Swiss-Prot record:
UniProt name for this protein: Alanine--tRNA ligase
Stated family: Belongs to the class-II aminoacyl-tRNA synthetase family.
Entry GO MF terms: alanine-tRNA ligase activity; aminoacyl-tRNA deacylase activity; ATP binding; catalytic activity, acting on a protein; transferase activity; tRNA binding
Domain of life: Bacteria
PANTHER family from the UniProt entry: ALANINE--TRNA LIGASE, CYTOPLASMIC, ALANYL-TRNA SYNTHETASE
Domain topic, free-text comment: Consists of three domains; the N-terminal catalytic domain, the editing domain and the C-terminal C-Ala domain. The editing domain removes incorrectly charged amino acids, while the C-Ala domain, along with tRNA(Ala), serves as a bridge to cooperatively bring together the editing and aminoacylation centers thus stimulating deacylation of misacylated tRNAs.
EC number: 6.1.1.7
Amino acid sequence: MKELTSSEVRQMFLDFFASKGHEIVPSKNLIPQDDPTLLWINSGVATLKKYFDGSVIPKNPRITNAQKAIRTNDIENVGKTARHHTLFEMMGNFSVGDYFKAEVIPWAWELLTSPEWYGLDKDLLYVTVYPKDQEAKKIWLEKTDLPEGHIYEVEDNFWDIGEGPSGPDSEIFFDRGPAFQNLPDNDPEMYPGGENERYLEIWNIVFSQFNHLPGLTDNAQYPELPHKNIDTGMGLERLVSVFQNGRTNFDTDLFLPIIRATEKMSPDYTYDATKDSESNTSFKVIADHIRAITFAIGDGALPANEGRGYVIRRLLRRAVLHGQKLGIQGEFLTKLVPIVAEIMQSYYPEIADNTEKIQKTIAAEEKRFNATLTGGLSLLNDVIAKAKASGQQVISGADAFKLSDTYGFPLELTQEQAADEGLTVDVVGFNDALQAQRTRARAARSNDKSMGVQNAVLTDLKVPSDYVGWSETEVSNAAIVAIIGHDNQGVDALLANAEPGDSVQLVFDKTPFYAEMGGQVADQGEVLNKQGEVVARVTDTQSAPNGQHVHTVEVVTSFKLGDQVALKVNLARHVAISKNHTATHLLDQTLRNVIGGDVHQAGSLVEPEYLRFDFTHEGPVSEQNLEKIETMVNQVIANNLPITWVETDIESAKKMGAVAVFGEKYGDVVRVVSIGDFNKEFDGGTHAQTTAELGLFKIVSESGIGAGVRRIEAVTGLAALSQFKAEEQALKVIADSLKAQKLTDAPAKVEDLQVEIKTLQRHLTSVEAQLANAAAQDVFKDVKTQNGYQYITAQLQVSGMDGLRQVVDTWRENYPSDVLVLATHVDDKVSLIVAASPEANKKGFKAGDLIKAIAPKIGGGGGGRPDMAQAGGKNPAGINDAFSAVSTFLDELA
């Protein structure tokens, strides 16, 4: 049999079908485009649905691809079975109303057996067909040289996922030989198509020839499709394992380089393909998950708490936990990204091009999880231990929620860890705790939006209402066309009138009040009667399902449906909001000018007091760039550029060069706002008339709010001036305390002070080292013996882990014992270190194993190398228990 690399296997498949007139379609983005039914592209045909449902006619009805895909429904099986993956590649050939069985079956056989192509031994290939599909069986037997005894009829060979196209299929299996047989010969599953390891399914060819109509349950009743299709799927990972004789898919060039790189970072474990062990599972999980994480982030997905971002976060945290099981400390996943890029370079060069961006995103997420990991593992271990000690089989929902809410452990990870210990998790209790938190959060919000839940009254409301706020902030003759409140039973209803003290929602036939949209908060103001008296105060304005602006008001004097009223927007507030909205456009454009192409708007909030702008960018924006951005925005303000807008169709807007917000959906007609020649964007908000109206722009803060997302908060006008003055006053206070003659002298004074502090710190470190060494001489005299090991345990008064390491260095000068265990605590933070002599290591002692055994006593966790390991915790009272556990551990060593 040929020995082929994964790249050769993939390319040979595509080349073969290209020779049969197929168009090679590149692998599409993992994030589905215009398909809300999918979280991820999860099959080879998923990106071609538009062709098979008839909504788009392909230029060439013959298509072939090798499509990356993600599935996580069987994530708990990854690493434990030979072939479960989260990211995989599906190779396929497709016919959209063109060829059918008579063509595809001989082609499949040619690709598999021809020496020019894969060249597999035909005697090792088996085929299954649907019993009623005698047509396919006949073609297999007459148009190929498949041995007659190698074809089986199987009832399951009918592809049907509900209403729509369906049909029989042929599955092709490769006989891996007796070495892979895991069942006796007489087992009912020991046949091609059965649940066994010997006969490996390598290809499925679906003959889509029937239409599953609503109400039909028997496929014999399905009518024939007028245009029959072919849909095939061949898993790259499976076929590569055949050509490389891999025991599992992981034992191939798609995974082994990742596993070998992970081995180098594990101090205690190596990968052995011939064994089924927990460590082997961890190696496989890491290799699988880093591939999925790398590709998903490369395609634009980011870790988050919901949707596909949650999938990435769960995969990453799952991989980190398996790294812990292998004794890997610190951030390690980023080091594997270049390995993935190198493996996939031939077909996915974009991974190598985006390696730095992918690594930054992973590093930020890994660091965030590692910050809480020790505490989370400690809590989880305690919870499991308590459950077992009390004879319980279930971890409470409250404990699982605390792990999720406080330590970032997704529920599924807690379930997996519990399952490993023979326990389950109270999911109902978890959901109750989650819902209770959400209820508390909603109650705590001071600005609940009345339109958060659309009621039936608003859904059915069809009365017309025009927004005139682009040119007016006051209307003298508006009619009340709807009053929405509660009836006597407290149910939402249309009312005929409103009385003082009521809180109701009003709809007018025309309104100047801007409804909250696109991050810009709503207008507020007043409703007046003909006499100019205030009858209601507008506190919020939202858009109803049918487009009307719905005004939440506090009623001052009574009014009724149909009354003519005047509407008056709070002008000062409206102007402040409009200026800040213009400032967000200036900031957006300037960020792209200064930082570059990876900046895209990720959200915004425009209030009268300040503006907030979220954008994609890896890592903090430097102080130098923040200064450039602030200066450039203020220069544009000083240039007094005109601000204009126009409504046009979306294609014309794109031709104008207008920038759209990524992920936003736009209608056929869009509004384009232009700020001179500086900026042009799709936008539906209100703005200043010229940039000079903003007066001044000041950045207040820049921070990270998630992996790959940054946030800038800023102010304009008098608020910006106040911010400058406040910072100047703070600098004056600092200058006075440093006795600086001028404000400009303060930085030099601070530098002098920093030099002095560093000098004192060095002196303090030296004194601490002397004290630690002095204490060490007494400690080293107290040597105990257990099971042939001499060991020392001691609690020292030093400043944390650095102080303990200094004592270890002194101990290593002459090794007065085989093992050294030291602890210290500052307030409630405990540091624990274990060191081993070379002789102890030769006898089989590993510091990392001991630290894992005793760290829970101090309420923490840790790990390290065989010669030295460390841990942190939050339970100083457990130090003596940890020391007592040392002798027990040594006594149990062989």
